[in-house]
Amino acid sequence: MLESIRLYKDLHDFELQGPTRVVEWIGDKSICVAGYDSAKRNEILQLLIPQKLHAKENPGLCPERDLKVEHGGFIDEPVYSLKHIPQSSLIVTSGPASCPLWVWQIGPEDRDVIQPISTLPSDAGKGTWTRIATTTSASPQILHGSQADSIRLTDIESTKQIHTLGVSGSDGVSTLCFLDSRTVFVCCMNGRQFIADIRMPGAASEGRVGEEGLSCVTWCSAVHPSKEDVCSTVASVSSEGHMCLTDPRNLSVPLKCATWCTPIPAASEQFLSICWAPALSDCISVSGFGGSVQIFDTKRWDSAMKEREAVFIHKGHSVMGTCEDGREPTVTAHAWHPWKERTVLSAASDGSLHVWNWSDLPVHDGTEL
């Protein structure tokens, strides 16, 4: 145990009231989490992280060592997705197919409540749930949908539909995100991917990761935002542990590929997740395969689908925690700190929330240290 702790610069173990599937940054000092228990009311909380974890310089001794509840609210439904509307105090949540999307207002500093202000209808069919994405715009808007042919853009204030993507097919959606304020990326569970312009109907380009017809394999993706003259890059991971990096301008041709020996296949698509590190070049993180989070450096990858080793694996949830039924916890969500290079937050099914920063380690590509 002591040897494992030496691998970290920082490792903080917090206990939430219940497990969460969402970890959403609100600014760079607080996060939103929400419960997903279908048998009871769930909390939606905005938590201020300790000063040591958001200070840009070493603050020395800090009196606050725990998470502090800034705002909170209750919902009668499980929360599967939560997104903050940029430059606003609004958040949007989605849950099971039978539930609407909820729009919430985070109260001002003198009020500690998160209160619902409106709902949007969900189009989710049986066995699916609505994915959501937000972007900066003059008027708050949300992109939402559960299937490729049902994705739409809605104005939050008026609740009026602004645009329908107009893409054919009932493929279940796993990932929705904006490349910019007008361009949308969609990844479907079966590996189908497309780019669409919200000003025009239909897909501008389309491709697929993985082999068509493998219904047992689920894919999800994350997009690394473009910077200056560097184009966006899509990272995709499958429930069997395959990864592909692609250029959004040509989704059918992988630039880099990898596979790794997963401890167990992802149990289902609900916890499968991949993220780009916002402040660490070429690094991605993957969770949903048991109680760990894997960090990969993609710099030296090529287009060959071969085994690569992670540069770091956070096993804290499986080592330090146990669920009420005695099973090993599964990581349910993780997110990178917005600007701290190696700092990651991860949540697990036992209600634990870890904030960790790993030490410098030799970077390898799975073939050499």
Curated annotation (Swiss-Prot):
Q: Which UniProt keywords apply?
A: Cytoplasm, Cytoskeleton, Repeat, WD repeat
The WD repeats extend over 74-114, 266-306, 326-366
For this chain's UniProt record, which GO biological process terms are given? cytoplasmic microtubule organization
Where this protein primarily resides, as one coarse class? Answer: cytoplasm
Q: Which domain of life is it from?
A: Eukaryota
Q: What role is this protein assigned?
A: Component of a multiprotein complex required for the assembly of the RNA endonuclease module of the integrator complex. Associates with ints9 and ints11 in the cytoplasm, stabilizing the ints9-ints11 heterodimer and blocking the active site of ints11. Brat1 then joins the complex and plugs the active site of ints11, leading to wdr73 release and nuclear import of ints9 and ints11.
- The name this protein goes by in its record: Integrator complex assembly factor WDR73
Record organism: Xenopus laevis (African clawed frog)
Q: Which gene encodes it?
A: wdr73
